[in-house]
Amino acid sequence: MPLVFFARVADVSLGTFRTIVIFRGHKFLASFIGFFEIIIWLVASAQVLTNLDQWYLALAYASGFSVGNYAGISIENRFAIGNELIRCISFNRDVLAGKLREEGFKVVSFDGDMGEAYPVELLLVIEKRRNVPSLIQLIKDLDPTAVYSVSDVKSVYEGPDIFPRRSLLHSTLMLLGKR
């Protein structure tokens, strides 16, 4: 019974992770994961199907499926594969973009308004998912009135290197919450 449960947790976790990786455009990694996913699934399914008189194996199989979905999503969140687009509206014009650039983020900014009385700055930042929490925290710290949204980006073409790059040490410190 534990074999069926844990095999099912493993194969569904891999399947969930594989599906998310496919969505992010990593075909080779998804194929590699799928190979191991199906082997584990065959072992778990064979145990249940050859012992249909043991109802608790079906229960372990179903429970493993449920836990595997949660585990797969958690694993993918931990790896934080891919990029995200952060759109930010700042009411403190010409402040936030400069500070974010000083911290090493690649920022595109536009001046705008929300009516005559509300000049704003619209910021666009494409950032690796693992760095987004520190970027959001920085936005909140620098401009608590800022409005932002975050969306997935399937692929990014970086083009010419016109933005300064952050060092690995700087990125690591940002991830740990130290600036």
UniProtKB/Swiss-Prot annotation:
Q: Which InterPro entries match?
A: DUF2179, DUF5698, UPF0316
**Residues annotated as transmembrane:** 28-48, 55-75
Work out whether the entry's keyword set contains DNA-binding.
Answer: no
Assigned GO CC terms: plasma membrane
Please indicate which superkingdom the organism of origin belongs to.
Answer: Bacteria
Annotated membrane topology is: Multi-pass membrane protein
* Main subcellular localisation: membrane
Q: Which family does it belong to?
A: Belongs to the UPF0316 family.
For this entry, the protein name equals: UPF0316 protein Ping_1367
Organism, as annotated = Psychromonas ingrahamii (strain DSM 17664 / CCUG 51855 / 37)
Source organism lineage? Bacteria, Pseudomonadati, Pseudomonadota, Gammaproteobacteria, Alteromonadales
